[in-house]
Design a protein with these regions (language model features):
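Bacterial N-terminal signal peptides
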Residues: 4-18
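Sec/Tat signal peptide C-region and signal peptidase I cleavage site
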Residues: 19-25
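Phosphate/dinucleotide-binding and metal-coordinating scaffold of catalytic cores
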Residues: 25-352
Length: 352
């Protein structure tokens, strides 16, 4: 599909699905996230010395962009994340890439300062499939609303400082949260540990909860952060200019989908206190106060089955077996979303 048609398709998808608060108009993304083409990169750094200590200093590295517009940029790298930074979970942890110099006006990284990079975790080919399914989850939510994180897939040659090759694997960059907020004409809520459900934008919260149910992700919270941390767990909150901890109409923006049943990573387990057998068992966790908005969104999303399935089918390098399983898993959700009786049953288990 040519770029023009892709852009037209994306615009049509937003106009149909971004039904919540249509007055919120989003700006376009920066160059890195203006295309879905797979980047070709080389990342050079002392990977054997990168510390997983949360207090460790970043290490210097070099990022090279291949293709028709090659460029070389100094960067600093640091380990990030919680579960995936643990050595027993990931041999290769997720990284934060910070640009040591401002990328030039013609750079694909123009306007970027620091980015999260989701890496392959383990050498096994299966882990590339888990990564691609998480990447797909981000793109599915992006198709539902511009109030979401953009992602960009890359084939990355990792090399040591002496030029010795380490490994070549797919990874993906996640849009900086401040760019998400700015792109949507909002302001980020900071320094707040907990909010009430009544402070959330009802349509945005319902959309969030239904989407997490669709991919069977339980590793999130819209109103509180982890112990000792700011709100929210695997979500960021944004609101109108001048937003405070007492504001209403807050929009939750989800991220980190590796614990989703759609991905089914081997290290993913249900959170404490949620009693399901495994992460593939769906559990609806939307608020009862948002049931009407959730039902409206379920009706809306059930009509978009084909366009959302097309996003899964477009994901590069997914194995046929992986694609079929994911399609079947999402298909179960769409069958439920299209059944009034099943939707009614779903609303009965909402959070009060």
């Amino acid at each position: 599909m040519c770029l023009v048609l892709k852009m037209a398709f994306a615009a049509a998808t937003f106009s149909i699905l971004s039904w919540a608060n249509p007055v919120r108009a989003a700006d376009g993304p920066k160059p890195l996230f203006a295309s879905d083409d797979v980047l070709s990169l080389t990342l050079t750094a002392p990977f054997d010395t990168i510390s997983r200590d949360i207090a460790a200093k970043p290490v210097p590295g070099v990022l090279k962009v291949g293709g028709a517009a090659p460029e070389t940029m100094p960067v600093t790298l640091s380990v990030r994340g919680i579960t995936r930074r643990k050595k027993e979970v990931c041999a290769f942890p997720p990284l934060r890439v910070e640009f040591s110099q401002k990328p030039g006006p013609s750079s694909i990284f123009k306007g970027q300062k620091r980015l999260k990079l989701v890496t392959h975790c383990q050498r096994s080919a299966d882990y590339q499939q888990y990564l691609l399914l998480e990447y797909t989850a981000y793109r599915l939510y992006r198709a539902l609303t511009p109030e979401s994180f953009n992602v960009r897939l890359a084939k990355i040659d990792y090399t040591y400082k002496d030029g010795q090759a380490l490994i070549t694997r797919l990874g993906f960059f996640i849009e900086d949260v401040n760019d998400v907020v700015k792109r949507n004409g909002q302001e980020r809520l900071r320094g707040v540990r907990r909010i009430s459900a009544s402070q959330l934008d009802a349509a945005a919260a319902a959309r969030y909860a239904v989407f997490e149910y669709m991919i069977s992700n339980l590793d999130w919270a819209m109103t509180a952060g982890p112990a000792g941390a700011d709100c929210c767990h695997n979500a960021r909150l944004m609101g109108a200019k001048g937003v405070t901890g007492a504001s209403t109409g807050l929009i939750p923006v989800p991220y980190d989908f590796d614990y989703a049943g759609l991905v089914n990573a081997p290290y993913a387990v249900p959170p404490d206190g949620i009693h399901v057998a495994n992460v593939k068992v769906r559990r609806y966790r939307g608020f009862c106060a948002h049931n009407e908005e959730a039902k409206a969104f379920l009706t809306q999303i059930s009509t978009r089955r084909d366009s959302l399935m097309a996003i899964l089918n477009e994901t590069p390098q997914l194995e046929d077996r992986t694609r079929r399983k994911a399609a079947g898993y999402l298909g179960d959700f769409f069958e439920e979303a299209g059944s009034p009786s099943k939707v009614a049953d779903l609303m009965k288990v909402c959070l009060r």
